[in-house]
Design a protein with these regions (language model features):
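Short acidic/polar hinge/loop motifs at secondary-structure boundaries
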Residues: 173-202, 328-330
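Gram-negative outer-membrane beta-barrel transporters
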Residues: 234, 490-497, 505-506, 596-600, ...
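Transmembrane beta-barrel wall of Gram-negative outer-membrane proteins
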Residues: 243-270, 275-324, 355-376, 430-432
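Surface-exposed extracellular loop regions of Gram-negative outer-membrane beta-barrel proteins
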Residues: 446-453, 507-509, 518, 532-579, ...
Length: 772
């Protein structure tokens, strides 16, 4: 008999005093600080750097962390508290905790007030994209330049991002080729309009995921057809400090008609600029069709259209030199002091954004799937295709070229930035107490032409560039094959063991007459995961494995054409990893979990893009290790809470090109992170949530040029720690509607996730949801 992790029933606490906890939580501002060091009026405390920094500097990080450990202590000590009768215990299939689904976005139609373990409602606050929803997870780090419409690789799992993590929709990868200013993952193209749940898989212990999954996988599961037709509308409107409006509207419809089922969704997002010129508008359509076939087969078709128009950020500093007073002076006083960005690759001043500089990007995701049971086996086929095009336009700025007035067209370019495609075939079958899985995967990373329709060469001021240099066909293509086999063995009622092997090969080859050197390699990576059910409520999972990360197309190009000139050979990364996870379940909803991990990434790939040095190369290794403690508790029948604390470190070795030697750590990797939240169930089925997040100081190396003749400089910068707090009130209106109000960054904390790009202050808004 297959069995599951046994959990106690939900329990209700009686007669326990918890008021002291709320008074002592400075982040919630529900009581007074006990120290005279923080007794200034609220307005002064929150001004000029944020109250979080002042509190931490006065009290110290140690005491701040202790306060949050007390909240975790409440969760851990729950069994000693008088509780009511336990509910019946559910019995489910045993799973490894490492691969457990730790984040579920509940279907608001069926569970509008759900407080399930790890549940994060996409209807909460202004949430527009996946990073908004995942920011409270212990192993997630964010380094966004803007709050809305950021197209960079802004989300990291355990310190690794970009080409080291994988984003899937229903199991198919959506990572792009990453060339010509594109990014491996553009989170703005994955709206929340048709999402049923999100699975966050930490690390690379699964054989199913290949060369982009060294750090982990974010798997988006779309909504399924329903027996009865459903129609849901959700809309938010808000604004705040220096940002006039943020709009987000979503519409979803699902239905199953005989053998044909479908889900349809559409969304629209719009945000006024917070940073100079950085407005955003997004439009999305998605359709998923399921067709039941004979012999219990299932055919699926998927289509998604995403269009985003965004203004490129204009630099709002008089100087890039931190020692120059102009570094702290703005060109435009209507917008915050901030760095800008450029059209990529930078090829002169026509690629520096002027007034109205913008992208108009359209992306299509096309999918086909077929699943067929064969006796007690299951055959699963997935095929996919990505199509992404960008229209780029830039206009003259008198601040850049004094011979031009503002607003003349200086650059018009079309970029076919992604043409990737691939597929996967997998067979799984039970043999007694064993489940065998074998599969093959193919991915082709590709892009199309870049065509410069117009460039003003006089304005561009780059004599080394000709118009012919700016229009070109793709020079490379990446072909990846993966083969894997895995056996999951239920040894006994308490032991579960999974062993697997994965073989990956890749070739980044030159095409269209390119003289770029080619890269190819292969590797075999073993995986071993063991789970022991200690008691009906206590489970431990341990894993040791290797994971591969192959160089992407941009890395291959800059390895060959950058400062290293293709010597020595660029090697793939290999992560030698170990993880340990323990979880205790108090009930079906309440739990405490401890996780520790260690990564030793050999031949870690460095991508340096300094003003006078561009190149890609291997260093000897990067070590990343850390631990987290998180949990959830139901205190009474009207109050529940969750909390998490994370400690993490990193170390790089063997960087022969780091002549400055300023840091041996990964950039933007905070040592401590803490989050917590409380949920109050109010009369009339209303729900009030308060959540808070602390992020420790982060370091990064800032490279800039100054002087005459121009010299390159490196500076180790530190971003201050910060605390943000959010509140959300949801009130049902009749049977089919809900009204919500929210405040994000409640105390107007001034903070940055990436150096030189400030985040907005207080954002206030309202939401309406209709379900039919």
């Amino acid at each position: 008999m297959r069995f599951g992790i046994l959990r106690k029933g939900d329990a209700t606490m009686r007669g326990w005093r918890w008021n002291w906890l709320i008074i002592e939580l400075p982040i919630l501002w529900l009581g007074n600080f006990s120290s005279s060091k923080v007794n200034a009026p609220t307005r002064d405390v929150f001004r000029n750097g944020g109250w979080a920094q002042k509190y931490i500097r006065s009290y110290g990080i140690r005491r701040f962390v202790i306060v949050w450990i007390l909240l975790m202590g409440v969760i851990v000590s729950k069994p000693a508290i008088s509780i009511g009768d336990s509910a019946p215990v559910d019995e489910t299939t045993q799973k490894h905790l490492t691969l457990d689904e730790i984040l579920v976005i509940g279907d608001a139609i069926t569970e509008p007030m759900s407080t399930e373990v790890g549940t994060k409602k996409i209807e909460k606050g202004k949430n527009i994209n996946i990073p908004d929803v995942l920011k409270f997870e212990p192993d997630i780090d964010l380094k966004r330049r803007t709050l809305i419409g950021d197209t960079t690789d802004s989300l990291a799992i355990r310190g690794v991002s970009g080409n080291r993590i994988m984003l899937n929709i229903n199991g198919r990868p959506v990572n792009a080729s990453g060339v010509v200013g594109g990014y491996y993952i553009d989170w703005s193209t994955i709206p929340l309009d048709n999402i049923e749940k999100i699975e966050l898989i930490r690390g690379g212990s699964s054989v199913r995921y290949g060369n982009n999954a060294l750090g982990g996988v974010v798997n988006v599961i779309t909504k399924k057809p329903t027996a009865k037709p459903t129609l849901t509308f959700f809309g938010t409107y808000g604004g705040g400090d220096d940002i006039d409006s943020i709009q987000n509207y979503r519409l979803t419809h699902t239905y199953q008609i005989g053998p044909l089922g479908y889900s349809l969704a559409g969304s629209y997002q719009k945000a006024d600029p917070f940073l100079w010129n950085n407005d955003f508008e997004g439009k999305n359509l998605a359709a998923s069709i399921n067709l039941d076939m004979p012999l219990d087969g299932l055919v699926t078709f998927g289509f998604q259209y995403a269009n985003s128009q965004r203004g490129l950020i204009r630099e709002n500093r008089l100087s890039d030199d931190p020692d120059n007073p102009g570094f702290y002076r703005r060109l435009n006083n209507d917008f915050p002091l901030a760095f800008g960005e450029t059209f990529s690759p930078y090829s002169g001043t026509a690629f520096i954004p002027g007034p109205g500089a913008n992208w108009d990007k359209t992306k299509y995701y096309l999918d086909f799937g077929y699943s067929q049971p064969i006796y007690d086996a299951l055959l699963d086929l997935k095929l996919y295709k990505n199509l992404e095009d960008r229209e780029e336009k830039n206009y003259s700025s008198s601040d850049i070229n004094i011979g031009y007035a503002d607003g003349a067209l200086v650059l018009d370019r079309d970029v076919e930035s992604d043409r990737s495609y691939g597929g996967n075939l997998e067979l799984s079958k039970f043999f007694g107490n064993h489940e065998l899985m074998i599969g093959v995967e193919n991915k082709v990373l590709a892009y199309g032409d870049t065509k410069t329709n117009y460039i003003d060469m006089t304005y561009n001021s780059a004599p080394w560039v000709t118009p012919n240099d700016l229009s070109f066909k793709p020079s490379s293509e990446g072909v990846c094959w993966g083969y894997y086999v895995q056996d999951t063995w239920e040894i006994s009622e308490r032991w579960l063991l999974t062993g697997g092997l994965r073989f990956d090969s890749y070739k980044n080859k030159s095409i269209n007459g390119s003289t770029l050197p080619e890269l190819e390699d292969d590797a075999l990576t073993p995986k071993l995961i063991g789970t022991y059910r200690i008691t009906n409520t206590d489970t431990m999972t341990a894993s040791i494995y290797q994971a591969l990360r192959t160089p992407g197309l941009p890395e291959t190009y800059w390895w060959a054409e950058g400062a290293t000139q293709g010597d020595p050979v660029l090697k793939p990364e290999k992560n030698n990893a170990a993880e340990l996870l323990y979880q205790h379940n108090f009930s079906q909803k309440d739990f405490v979990r401890v996780c520790a991990y260690y990564y030793n990434i050999e031949d870690y790939i460095m991508f340096r893009f300094d003003p006078s040095w561009r190149g890609v190369y291997n260093i000897d290794k990067a070590e990343i290790y850390g631990a987290s403690l998180d949990g959830r508790a139901t205190f009474t029948n009207w109050l529940s809470g969750n909390a998490a604390i994370t400690w993490q470190k990193s170390k790089k070795e063997g960087d022969i090109y780091d002549e400055a030697g300023l840091s041996d750590e990964i950039d933007y990797f905070p040592e401590w992170k803490v989050s917590a939240g409380l949920e109050f169930k109010l009369p009339y089925q209303s729900v009030f949530n308060v959540t808070a997040r602390y992020v420790d100081e982060r370091q990064a190396i800032y490279a800039y040029s100054s002087g005459w003749p121009t010299q390159q400089h490196f500076k180790l910068i530190e971003l201050d720690p910060y605390i943000t707090a959010d509140i959300n009130l949801k009130v049902p209106v009749g049977k089919h509607a809900e009204l919500s109000g929210y405040v994000e960054n409640l105390f107007g904390e001034e903070y940055e996730e990436q150096f030189g790009y400030p985040m907005p202050g207080i954002i206030i808004g309202a939401a309406l949801k209709l379900s039919l």
